[in-house]
Structures are given as structure tokens and as C-alpha cells.
């Protein structure tokens, strides 16, 4: 699906319709020293079963693509769409 790189939509902080930049959401780095991560690694050591079950078959064919829009006036970022797509392409719109 082709989606424009810039859209005009409502900004809750500016309380008006403004131009927004569109980008694809990317997850941040996982913290290796977080308690859950340390607990998971400790449980995985040695012999025995997996802490979480391995998934044998998958129910979904695609992942949900989340877009993040940034207001060009105030700089506020917010998630925009979570749509199921195989491919997402951000394109410049020629007017």
C-alpha cells in the first residue's frame, strides 16, 4: 500500500488541522538489565523446558504496520494507524 509522507490532519495539542510527517513505527532497544529479561535468562540456563512455549503454527500471515505522525508545528508524535499490510511504502504526493 502506498501512503503519503505528509498528511494534513488534526493535532490535539495545537487543537487544529496541521501538516504532519508520517513515519513507520520501530520498536526501541530491549533493556538487557530489566528484571524480566534477567529472570528469563536465568530460567533458560541449564537443562529443562523453555520458559515460554515455542509457537508451532502461526495464525496471522502479516504483522500490523503502525504509523507515527509528527506535527510540524508543535512536534507532537502519536501513533496513527495499525493496519495489516504485507508491504507499506511512503511516497511523496505530487500536487
Curated annotation (Swiss-Prot):
Q: What keywords are assigned to this protein?
A: Metal-binding, Ribonucleoprotein, Ribosomal protein, RNA-binding, rRNA-binding, Zinc, Zinc-finger
Name any GO cellular component annotation: ribonucleoprotein complex
The protein's GO terms of the molecular function aspect are: large ribosomal subunit rRNA binding; structural constituent of ribosome; zinc ion binding
Q: How does it assemble?
A: Part of the 50S ribosomal subunit.
Query: Which InterPro entries does the entry link to?
Result: Ribosomal_eL44 (IPR000552), Ribosomal_LSU_eL42 (IPR053708), Ribosomal_zn-bd (IPR011332)
Q: What is this protein called?
A: Large ribosomal subunit protein eL42
Cofactor: binding comment: Binds 1 zinc ion per subunit.
A single Gene Ontology biological process assigned to it is: translation
Keyword Transmembrane (UniProt):
no
Residue spans annotated as Zn fingers (C4-type) read 11-74
Name of the gene encoding the protein in the UniProt record: rpl44e
Name a Pfam family for this protein: Ribosomal_L44
The entry sums up its family as follows:
Belongs to the eukaryotic ribosomal protein eL42 family.
Q: What does this protein do?
A: Binds to the 23S rRNA.
SUPFAM superfamilies membership: Zn-binding ribosomal proteins
| Disulfide-bonded cysteines | none
State where Zn(2+) binds. 11, 14, 71, 74
Q: Which cofactor does it need?
A: Zn(2+)
Amino acid at each position: 500500500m502506498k501512503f503519503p509522507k505528509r498528511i494534513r490532519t488534526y493535532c490535539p495539542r495545537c487543537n487544529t488541522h496541521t501538516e504532519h510527517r508520517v513515519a513507520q513505527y520501530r520498536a526501541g532497544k530491549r533493556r538487557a538489565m530489566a528484571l524480566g529479561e534477567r529472570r528469563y535468562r536465568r530460567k533458560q540456563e541449564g537443562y529443562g523446558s523453555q520458559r515460554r512455549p515455542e509457537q508451532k503454527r502461526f495464525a496471522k500471515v502479516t504483522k500490523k504496520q503502525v504509523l507515527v505522525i509528527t506535527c510540524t508545528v508543535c512536534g507532537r508524535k502519536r501513533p496513527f494507524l495499525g493496519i495489516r499490510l504485507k508491504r507499506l511504502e511512503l511516497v511523496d504526493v505530487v500536487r
